[in-house]
UniProtKB/Swiss-Prot annotation:
The gene is Slc27a4. It comes from Mus musculus (Mouse). This is Long-chain fatty acid transport protein 4. GO terms for molecular function: arachidonate-CoA ligase activity; long-chain fatty acid transmembrane transporter activity; long-chain fatty acid-CoA ligase activity; nucleotide binding; oleoyl-CoA ligase activity; palmitoyl-CoA ligase activity; very long-chain fatty acid-CoA ligase activity. Gene3D superfamilies: 3.30.300.30, N-terminal domain of ligase-like. Its EC number is 6.2.1.15, 6.2.1.3, 6.2.1.-. The chain crosses the membrane at residues 20-42, 139-156. Keywords: Endoplasmic reticulum, Fatty acid metabolism, Ligase, Lipid metabolism, Lipid transport, Membrane, Nucleotide-binding, Transmembrane, Transmembrane helix, Transport.
Length: 643
């Protein structure tokens, strides 16, 4: 900004005051520019101009369409109707579990029967119906049918039980609950504590003895319902579509609000940014109660006319066979799925598929190249985003390890920023003017996005709980008087504007005066331990500053040569990042999106009287890992053992 002002000032002075000819003015400005470090600007411009222009065009296209749909009061069901009209007999959804194919017309008719049935039962626009069901075609038809009536679906995580499940139902204020027959036992566990006015419907196989007494079998009721479209509700593009619950890794799940424009924006930025085509076939094995599976995946069917193959759950052994069977051209991934695939023994199917793109987020940089080269996937379409965030990113040119970019030349076009935070408390650091301090290239910081409620691409729809909203909004971030969304994620930007994920706030811990990135350490340890699941976290040790690193490894101790492992770590990780404690256990508990649940692991710590799994600690004198028994634990607690 200062350089630009200086150049403009020099231009005016040279031309208006000195009255120099344009050739001399231009030469003078060039000298001033290069003398001010402008050659870096030129280098960045040359290397990023094509990327930035393409990204800007994608942003402009989506923004233009969103504004048009706002004026026309479009909704997701209305946009889907245009797809049905365009190709009614094209396959829309395929459920791998039963090899069931639904055309766009069939999906349209099923969802209309849902809308008519709910309307006949007294539900109306603005009411909420909870949906608790594993992946299948009906899942999509049910929430889409609710949306046709203006009813808002609360999409419940199928891994939730008891208190967490009850919490989600209570906070949604649902008037009805539709659950899959496979979830009947979970509903029976909490049935006594549910509101007596809550209507219960079961979809799938019907066995009256396995469901609460008041439950009705939904499937025959839908067959009898009219299949014509009910009257369109008075809803627009910024009205609520459904609710998606956060994973709940740090507490009870929160209901994030998804409005129609957000659904469109998330699906379409991916569609245009990664150059998808209507004839692509998407393999979606991600849970449909989360945005990656339901918006990024299913959204390509509803909004752009693609065929989507739905799988109940991810299977590493069946992944490529499914892709071949259904001629998939795009596969979705999240979190650790790519590592699970790499961990499979080589097979013929992994080179006979037609997949041209892997679409998702969370692919570790350490296995990125191995994944794309082994499975012959030309394009890794990595993106960054959360259901509720207003600062999504896309790695449109497959930069290895990057989750997206922001223009260094025209950064104001997409108002996101990395801001400095306190390394211990993760609180925002502000300058003398009270405004957050932006990070320089190479400097880690929290990603924030400026909130502009009038702009559908910049608005923050938040959560049902206002208290949760307050924790995600900061004031005076870009300038005085503004507001910004706090992602809670630490990223770092390189000189060209590419952004790399570092850590989620709370996942970084400090040891020996240094910050330890759990994400980086987990990636290294997993690679060294034959792609085993590894969760890294900090534990408190009496008499020491910070937290000592501990790694929980989902692998038998017999699979690890501890002496060799310790020696290899010396080459792979700096001293402060090497885990002090190791815990070997049968499996690590994960969320539905494959995030490790570390809360209980932290609580249990390294106390052998609490943890019954094999424990080891890094003996500083011997330079290797030794068994951590009660005697060693006592010495560590007393400060007699040097760590």
């Amino acid at each position: 900004m200062l350089l630009g002002a200086s150049l403009v000032g020099a231009l005016l002075f040279s031309k208006l005051v000195l009255k120099l000819p344009w050739t001399q003015v231009g030469f003078s400005l060039l000298l001033l520019y290069l003398g001010s470090g402008g050659w870096r600007f030129i280098r960045v411009f040359i290397k990023t101009v094509r990327r930035d222009i393409f990204g800007g065009m994608v942003l402009l296209k989506v923004k233009t369409k969103v504004r048009r749909y706002l004026q026309e009061r479009k909704t997701v069901p209305l946009l889907f109707a245009s797809m049905v009209q365009r190709h009614p007999d094209k396959t829309a959804l395929i459920f791998e579990g039963t090899d069931t194919h639904w055309t766009f017309r069939q999906l349209d008719e099923y969802s209309s029967s849902v809308a008519n049935f709910l309307q006949a039962r007294g539900l109306a626009s603005g009411n909420v119906v909870a949906l608790f069901m594993e992946n299948r075609n009906e899942f999509v038809g049910l929430w889409l049918g609710m949306a046709k009536l203006g009813v808002e679906a609360a999409l419940i995580n199928t891994n939730l039980r008891r208190d967490a499940l009850r919490h989600c139902l209570d906070t949604s204020k649902a008037r009805a609950l539709i659950f899959g027959s496979e979830m009947a036992s979970a509903i029976c566990e909490i049935h006594a504590s549910l509101e007596p006015t809550l209507s219960l419907f079961c979809s799938g196989s019907w066995e009256p003895s396995t469901v609460p007494v008041s439950t009705e079998h939904l499937d025959p009721l839908l067959e009898d319902a009219p299949k014509h479209l009910p009257s369109h509700p008075d809803k627009g593009f910024t009205d609520k579509l459904f609710y998606i619950y956060t994973s709940g890794t740090t507490g009870l799940p929160k209901a994030a609000i998804v409005v129609h424009s957000r659904y469109y924006r998330m699906a379409s930025l991916v569609y245009y940014g990664f150059r998808m085509r209507p004839d692509d076939i998407v393999y979606d094995c991600l849970p449909l109660y989360h945005s990656a599976g339901n918006i990024v995946g299913i959204g390509q069917c509803l909004l752009h006319g693609m065929t989507v193959v739905i799988r109940k759950k991810f299977s590493a052994s069946r992944f490529w066979d499914d892709c071949i069977k259904y001629n998939c051209t795009i596969v979705q991934y999240i979190g650790e799925l790519c590592r699970y695939l790499l961990n499979q023994p080589p097979r013929e199917a992994e080179s006979r598929h037609k997949v041209r793109m892997a679409l998702g987020n969370g692919l570790r940089q350490s296995i990125w190249t191995d994944f794309s080269s082994r499975f012959h996937i030309p394009q890794v379409a990595e993106f960054y985003g959360a259901t509720e965030c207003n600062c999504s990113l896309g790695n449109f040119d497959s930069r290895v390890g990057a989750c997206g970019f922001n223009s260094r030349i025209l950064s104001f076009v997409y108002p996101i920023r990395l801001v400095r935070v306190n390394e211990d408390t993760m609180e925002l650091i502000r300058g003398p003017d009270g405004v957050c301090i932006p990070c320089q290239p190479g400097q880690p910081g929290q990603l924030v996005g400026r909130i502009i409620q009038q702009d559908p691409l910049r608005r923050f729809d938040g959560y049902l709980n206002q208290g949760a909203n307050n924790k995600k909004i900061a004031n005076d971030v870009f300038k005085k008087g503004d507001q910004a969304y706090l992602t809670g994620d630490v990223l770092v930007m390189d000189e060209l504007g590419y952004l790399y994920f570092r850590d989620r706030t709370g996942d970084t811990f400090r040891w020996k005066g240094e910050n330890v990135s759990t994400t980086e350490v987990e990636g290294t340890l997993s690679r060294l331990l034959h792609m085993a699941d590894v969760a890294v976290y900090g534990v408190e040790v009496p008499g020491t500053e910070g937290r000592a690193g501990m790694a929980a490894v989902a692998s038998p101790i017999s699979n690890c040569d501890l002496e060799s492992f310790a020696q290899t770590l010396k080459k792979e990780l700096p001293l402060y990042a090497r885990p002090i404690f190791l815990r070997f256990l049968p499996e690590l508990h994960k969320t539905g999106t494959f995030k490790f649940q570390k809360t209980e692991l932290r609580k249990e710590g390294f106390d052998p009287s609490v943890v019954k799994d094999p424990l080891f600690y890094l003996d500083a004198r011997k330079g290797c890992y030794v068994a951590l028994d009660q005697e060693a634990y006592t010495r560590i607690q007393a400060g007699e053992e040097k760590l």
